[in-house]
């Protein structure tokens, strides 16, 4: 428990185990849903490569 309290002071661990990286300013709060989806966009490009190759029969 002492180690946890020491680490929590160094790293500021959230007790609810949520990963909290940053919060957008209030003026940009309407973009929160878009920002939540943005990390997944590169995966779509990877999947697009497979769909493209399937459409040309993996030539």
UniProtKB/Swiss-Prot annotation:
Topology in the membrane?
Single-pass membrane protein
- Name the domain of life this protein comes from: Eukaryota
Propeptide segments, given as residue ranges:
1-22
The subcellular localization recorded is:
Plastid, Chloroplast thylakoid membrane
The record's InterPro entries line, in alphabetical order, gives:
PSII_PsbK (IPR003687), PSII_PsbK_sf (IPR037270)
Keyword Plastid belongs to the record: yes
Q: Which cysteines are joined by disulfide bonds?
A: none
Give the record's keywords alphabetically: Chloroplast, Membrane, Photosynthesis, Photosystem II, Plastid, Reaction center, Thylakoid, Transmembrane, Transmembrane helix
Q: Where are the transmembrane segments?
A: 30-50
Could you provide one GO biological process annotation from this protein's UniProt record? photosynthesis
- One matching Pfam family: PsbK
Choose one Gene Ontology CC annotation of this protein and give it: photosystem II reaction center
Q: Which family does it belong to?
A: Belongs to the PsbK family.
Do you know which HAMAP family this protein is assigned to?
Answer: PSII_PsbK
| Function per UniProt | One of the components of the core complex of photosystem II (PSII). PSII is a light-driven water:plastoquinone oxidoreductase that uses light energy to abstract electrons from H(2)O, generating O(2) and a proton gradient subsequently used for ATP formation. It consists of a core antenna complex that captures photons, and an electron transfer chain that converts photonic excitation into a charge separation.
PANTHER family per record: PHOTOSYSTEM II REACTION CENTER PROTEIN K, PTHR35325
What subunit structure does UniProt give? PSII is composed of 1 copy each of membrane proteins PsbA, PsbB, PsbC, PsbD, PsbE, PsbF, PsbH, PsbI, PsbJ, PsbK, PsbL, PsbM, PsbT, PsbX, PsbY, PsbZ, Psb30/Ycf12, at least 3 peripheral proteins of the oxygen-evolving complex and a large number of cofactors. It forms dimeric complexes.
For this entry, the protein name equals Photosystem II reaction center protein K
Kindly list the organism's lineage.
Answer: Eukaryota, Viridiplantae, Streptophyta, Charophyceae, Charales
Q: Which gene encodes it?
A: psbK
